[in-house]
């Protein structure tokens, strides 16, 4: 009889085998997912129900196919969320890849927000002014090692175990001449021991993961109707040659890109996301991004010494500590080229050390 409890535990664990292992990505945020809403600054009020949340019979998610099917019964004078004939494709330059969808930003916005929620993230920031949707920090539960004990306990206390990594994603939406361009960037943190005695841990940034970004782009392509085989083919296309170089002089550094202004402007925006800058505002007519550096300690500070379960509520949003505002300026240089320079908060010249540091960071992303 003493073997019965053990037998039941093994049976329960076996029944869950393959659930987590079959997923390379299984994110979970610590808070309840908010209701899907359309940013009021993007969509003008209308009397019809074109932007209503599709009825998914209580599942809490909305798919493009369900949305389209439900809207066929209620035609409108303007297109629904994404017309069936529209396609999505991948474009790339240097090490960067982005998605181009034949739809307006107003149509794309709710699909992207719902996409992140369906993948286990909380949408922490929505900025229609800058076209940014950013998730909260979340852990990839698929990285938790699985054994009999952990699988069994996980059925009762899912949050008992956690990983030493957290991820967040920022999606930037830009209206382009060939459709809406969607740029996706990843930021990561990892927990490391702060003392030799391993009695204290701290969180520190880890490099952006291009493979993780590619996987999320692949999933997003599927959401926009691209077949899986086609999505994988588009992602594995050959990388383009270097298209940017650093130019230095006595006054500092600037970056020269083999791109016209329109494309250079959008690529610089993605690069700023990836290297850890918060874009507070932008003025495309002047080619200027107004940015602040995101302090990882302020963005990801944990509660200290609150017991074993404090970790379960670790990722809580906090306002970034104030840092000097900078201007990243993109100038048309003629002959299909653009130049990127760094200025101070009021347009004055930034010091040479700041210029060199930021230009080098951008070069790694834009070359």
Swiss-Prot record:
Example GO BP: Gram-negative-bacterium-type cell outer membrane assembly
Native organism: Thiobacillus denitrificans (strain ATCC 25259 / T1)
Subunit comment: Part of the Bam complex.
Signal peptide boundaries: 1-16
This protein's name: Outer membrane protein assembly factor BamC
Role according to the record: Part of the outer membrane protein assembly complex, which is involved in assembly and insertion of beta-barrel proteins into the outer membrane.
Transmembrane segments annotated in the record for this chain: none
Compartmental location: Cell outer membrane
InterPro entries in the record: BamC, BamC_C, NlpB/DapX
Keyword terms, alphabetized: Cell outer membrane, Lipoprotein, Membrane, Palmitate, Signal
Keyword hit for Magnesium: no
Gene3D superfamilies for this protein: Outer membrane protein assembly factor BamC
């Amino acid at each position: 009889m003493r073997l019965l409890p053990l037998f039941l535990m093994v049976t329960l664990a076996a029944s869950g085998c393959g659930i987590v292992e079959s997923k390379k990505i299984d994110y979970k945020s610590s808070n309840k997912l908010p209701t899907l809403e359309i940013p009021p600054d993007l969509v003008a009020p209308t009397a019809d129900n074109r932007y209503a949340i599709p009825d998914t019979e209580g599942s809490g998610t909305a798919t493009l196919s369900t949305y389209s099917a439900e809207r066929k019964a209620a035609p409108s004078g303007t297109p629904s969320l994404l017309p069936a004939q529209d396609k999505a494709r991948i474009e790339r330059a240097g090490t960067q890849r982005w998605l181009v969808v034949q739809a307006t930003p107003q149509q794309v916005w709710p699909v992207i927000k719902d996409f992140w929620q369906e993948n286990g993230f909380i949408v922490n920031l929505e900025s229609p002014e800058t076209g940014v949707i950013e998730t909260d920090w979340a852990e990839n539960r698929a990285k938790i090692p699985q054994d009999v004990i952990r699988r069994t306990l996980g059925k009762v206390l899912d949050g008992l175990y956690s990983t030493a990594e957290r991820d967040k994603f920022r999606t930037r939406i830009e209206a382009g001449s060939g459709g809406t361009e969607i740029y996706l960037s990843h930021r990561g943190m990892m927990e490391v021991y702060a003392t030799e005695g391993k009695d204290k841990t701290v969180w520190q940034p880890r490099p952006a993961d291009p493979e993780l970004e590619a996987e999320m782009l692949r999933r997003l392509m599927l959401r926009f109707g691209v077949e899986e085989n086609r999505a994988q083919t588009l992602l594995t296309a050959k990388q383009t040659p270097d298209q940017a170089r650093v130019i230095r002089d006595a006054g500092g550094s600037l970056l020269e890109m083999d791109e016209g202004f329109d494309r250079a402007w959008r690529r610089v925006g993605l690069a700023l996301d990836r290297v850890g800058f918060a874009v507070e505002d932008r003025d495309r007519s002047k080619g200027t991004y107004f940015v602040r550096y995101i302090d990882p300690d302020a963005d990801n500070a944990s509660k200290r010494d609150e017991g074993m379960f404090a970790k379960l509520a670790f990722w809580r949003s906090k306002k970034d500590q104030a840092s000097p505002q900078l201007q990243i300026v993109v100038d048309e240089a003629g002959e299909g080229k653009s130049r990127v320079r760094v200025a101070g908060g009021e347009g004055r010249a930034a010091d040479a050390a700041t210029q060199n540091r930021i230009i080098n960071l951008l070069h790694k992303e834009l070359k």
